[in-house]
């Protein structure tokens, strides 16, 4: 790997009396990073699904067209996990994880804020493909980090705890759509329909993901 993605340089070994306490503190600090970082990946993993009813209601796309567009996500994610796993093993996970999160959030933010990014099936397919590709940068550095910081006898427990990040992150886009509905109601005085907030379904989670990338780093 090159530039900031290169593995972190070796540092001098700590005095023996500091190793145990420092190790315990740092590995939970690292765990917090991969836990909340991976949870934030789920902000923009499937939030496009929440925007689809609005796109249909607004008459912009049909269900069949959105099905074609959505196929890009699974294709890209599968390919990316295969490719990015090898790259992650040769990189600095502190950079690799938040960088993918930042780019994934950027894709969704652009789709929500810039009309050109949702102006046609082809461009939307590309944007969803890119988002799926960047999503593949989430799991590999997390798995590698847990292997490095926890022994074999501890990994079952730590991976089980880490796995709850999926659930925490997965519930947030729905909460953000509710927030968008509340903002629309306070601004317009009427209840929001799906066609009124489909953009927010994309860029609210996108912006949140990009913000989360900062403390994760």
What would you call each of these model-derived segments?
Residues 199-217:
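Symmetry-related core transmembrane helices of the 12-TM Major Facilitator Superfamily/SLC fold
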Residues 46, 74-82, 171:
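Residue-level signature of mid-helix packing/kink "hotspots" within the transmembrane helices
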Residues 127-165:
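Cytoplasmic helix-loop-helix junction between adjacent transmembrane helices
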Residues 102-118:
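C-terminal ends and interior cores of transmembrane alpha-helices
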Residues 80-93:
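Helix-to-loop junctions at the C-terminal end of transmembrane segments
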Residues 160-182:
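Glycine-rich segments within core transmembrane alpha-helices of 12-TM secondary carriers
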Residues 29-63:
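Extracytoplasmic
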């Amino acid at each position: 790997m090159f530039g900031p993605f290169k593995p972190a340089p070796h540092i001098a070994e700590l005095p023996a009396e500091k190793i145990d306490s420092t190790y315990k503190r740092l590995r939970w600090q690292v765990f917090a990073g991969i836990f909340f970082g991976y949870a934030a990946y789920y902000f923009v993993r499937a939030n496009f699904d929440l925007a689809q009813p609005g796109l249909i209601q607004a008459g912009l796309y049909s269900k069949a067209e959105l099905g074609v567009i959505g196929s890009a996500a699974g294709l890209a994610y599968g390919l990316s996990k295969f490719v990015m796993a090898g790259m992650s093993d040769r990189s600095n996970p502190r950079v690799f994880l938040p960088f993918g999160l930042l780019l994934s959030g950027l894709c969704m933010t652009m789709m929500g804020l810039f009309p050109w990014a949702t102006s046609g099936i082809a461009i939307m397919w590309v944007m969803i493909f890119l988002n799926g590709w960047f999503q593949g940068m989430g799991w590999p550095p997390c798995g590698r980090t847990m292997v490095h910081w926890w022994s074999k006898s501890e990994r079952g427990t730590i991976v089980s705890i880490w796995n709850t990040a999926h659930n925490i992150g997965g519930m947030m886009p729905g909460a953000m759509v509710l927030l968008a509905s509340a903002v629309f109601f306070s601004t317009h005085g009427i209840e929001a329909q799906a066609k009124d907030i489909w953009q927010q379904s994309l860029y609210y989670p996108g912006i949140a993901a990009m913000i989360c990338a900062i403390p994760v780093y």
